[in-house]
Amino acid sequence: MSFRKFTATADPEKDETIARKGHFYGVYLLCSQSLDSRYRGKCYVGFTVNPKRRIKQHNRGCDFGGAKKTSRKGPWQMVMIVHGFPNNIVALQFEWAWQQPTLSTRLKIFPELKRKNPRESHFDYNFRILNRMLGVGPWNRLALKIRWLETDYERGFEVPLPRHMEIVSGKVSISSSQRRKGEDAAATVPVAWAPECHLCMQRIDQPERSRLGCTNPTCRLTCHMLCLANYLLGDEPGHYIPVGGECPLCETRLSWSALLQRKRLLNGIPEELLDQEEADEDLSDGPDVDSDVEVLESD
């Protein structure tokens, strides 16, 4: 049996700022540390935009923003979180499927996920569901990070994950600034764009909307977004959005999500968007949404 090795990128004892407020979407797994044997070891799957705040809400109870299903059944530990979703809708769909594998169309092909095995812990059962989810579409084409928050629970994945997914360790912290550390510097580096697409050799009209380049700052790749997408898809018929591939000029390994992020930084964030983010606290800094689904499994 082969397991994928862990890739630790953070000191587990320290917080790591990985996203700015309003741009983090995570689906987490809680495990109860209750002294009551009825609840100890039970698990809960939820969605959050701020993991540190969310675990505090769960442990304080539903009167303080926690979920009704976790009240008085803790204390809880947030042991792992999956993040890197492009938006909250995709993350909430992932959350629902993880909660309800027997109802998910994507997971019905795995009859072994219908119930927990007799001697299997609740954590191991939920981890087994997650392992299968990450290997099937549409989730297997997302640039996701599987982040361990508690080292005592870390283990390998029995079913190998897609190569573009990362397994990392370390706590999560959300930055309140409009940009992550280093983003301002990246956005101010001058780019020597070519007037034509390197792939179709046609002029690029409306470059702010349709132009993409390499993430390697020394590479002069200039392409239409559609041309580069088709190039990276290569021999993947039936797909419209690539996962990644090699730069056609410098052969740097590219991630499609990183290309789009770089494009956003180079174009800048419109002032009206910044104003909306600062004004709409209910969207970016309000209570998290939890699906009203019970996942505290019984033996």
From Swiss-Prot:
It holds the Pfam family GIY-YIG. It is an enzyme of class 3 (hydrolase). A zinc finger (SLX1-type) spans 197-250. It is found in: Nucleus. One of its GO terms (cellular component) is Slx1-Slx4 complex. The keyword Protein transport does not apply. Signal peptide: none annotated. Catalytic subunit of a heterodimeric structure-specific endonuclease that resolves DNA secondary structures generated during DNA repair and recombination. Has endonuclease activity towards branched DNA substrates, introducing single-strand cuts in duplex DNA close to junctions with ss-DNA. This is Structure-specific endonuclease subunit SLX1 homolog. It comes from Drosophila ananassae. The gene is slx1.
